[in-house]
A protein has these predicted regions:
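SAM cofactor-binding core of SAM-dependent methyltransferases
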Residues: 1-75
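Class I S-adenosyl-L-methionine
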Residues: 6-7, 43-62, 73-237
Length: 237
């Protein structure tokens, strides 16, 4: 099974989990240099990379694409939100005037132009993921982001990229993680069960992008094994 793990360049959660399977040929892809990691490729996965499809075409065609695009710009947790709403008809983005008005009420001021760079990066990566999946047409695909992320509205309403929302809590899979309600958007039902486990770890206490972007190994393995089960089931028909 050939797997492309997109944006797997910080915590490298997919690489760490998938290397345990001898029947998986995983290719982790991102923008951070990892010369010591086998089958890692440094590629800009955003739609700003005009050679994106050409560069990825050099790799074996994927059976599975799993991706964790940057989530910061889509977050509901932002004090000043980038997106007011995303519908099938329109996208409303917080403009400069409204941003500065809200900024006046905050104890820690935010930079409008820095925020726009973050927004454009997030949007370009979301576009890149969908372009990749639609071009290479893997049998299975999974995209991870916070459950409350606006990226799901962007996929469904702006890009007409439909899928199934599979919800998970990280502490159900590893008690060293915070709850971190997450969605794994996919073309299949992954059958993830939500537990009732209380976490002793608060999300606010998790520091550093690497730690915040980490995914429990057992959850990644469960997703992959579910996909493999479905793949084998297809062979029997």
């Amino acid at each position: 099974m050939v797997v492309w793990s997109l944006f797997d360049d910080n915590a490298m959660s997919y690489n760490e989990a998938l290397k345990e399977y001898d029947w998986v040929q995983n290719y982790s892809i991102g923008i951070i240099e990892h010369k010591e990691v086998e089958n890692y490729y440094k590629i800009d996965l955003s739609c700003f990379n005009v050679n994106l499809i050409k560069e990825l075409s050099k790799l074996p065609k994927p059976d599975v694409i799993i991706a964790s695009p940057p989530c910061e710009s889509w977050s509901y947790a932002m004090l000043i939100k980038n997106y007011r709403y995303i519908t099938q008809d329109s996208i409303k983005i917080t403009n400069y005037k409204d941003f500065m008005k809200e900024n006046e009420t905050l104890p820690f001021k935010q930079d409008f132009f820095k925020r726009q760079r973050t927004r454009l990066l997030g949007e370009s990566c979301a576009l890149g993921v969908v372009e990749i999946i639609r071009h290479f047409r893997p049998k299975f695909w999974v995209i991870e982001n916070p459950r409350a992320s606006k990226i799901w509205d962007y996929f469904q309403n702006f890009l007409d990229f439909q899928g199934i929302k599979n919800f998970a809590n990280y502490n159900d899979w590893d008690n060293t993680y915070s709850k971190k309600p997450t969605c794994f958007y996919s073309n299949i039902d992954l059958g993830i069960k939500l537990g009732n486990v209380k976490s002793s770890i608060k999300w606010s206490s998790v520091s550093g992008y690497k730690n915040r972007s980490s995914i429990p190994k057992e959850l990644v393995k469960y997703i992959l094994e579910t996909i493999e089960f479905r793949r084998k089931a297809q062979w029997t028909y």
